[in-house]
Amino acid sequence: MNIEIVKKQMERLLKYAHTPVFTVESCYNMAYGSISMASNIALELGDCQLSIAIDRLWDDTYRELFLNAYREELAQQ
């Protein structure tokens, strides 16, 4: 596992959040669950640095992107 795999998954879920088929809230929940699992798997494999990088990826980037998408969805309602 590496950080690029996690980034691809987050980008995929972020794209889904902008489609009418999925709600942003459900994509946010899937993304948060995926990030948490990836971070825990990295810890289980003994790669603390990767786990920290995954957590920071969520905290510094994708959390805010999903929240912005959610705000956009609310503004359209």
Give each language-model segment a name.
Residues 8, 48, 75-76:
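Intrinsically disordered, low-complexity regions enriched in polar/acidic and amide residues
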Residues 1-32:
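N-terminal acidic leader/helix
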Residues 1-4, 70-77:
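Short intrinsically disordered terminal tails
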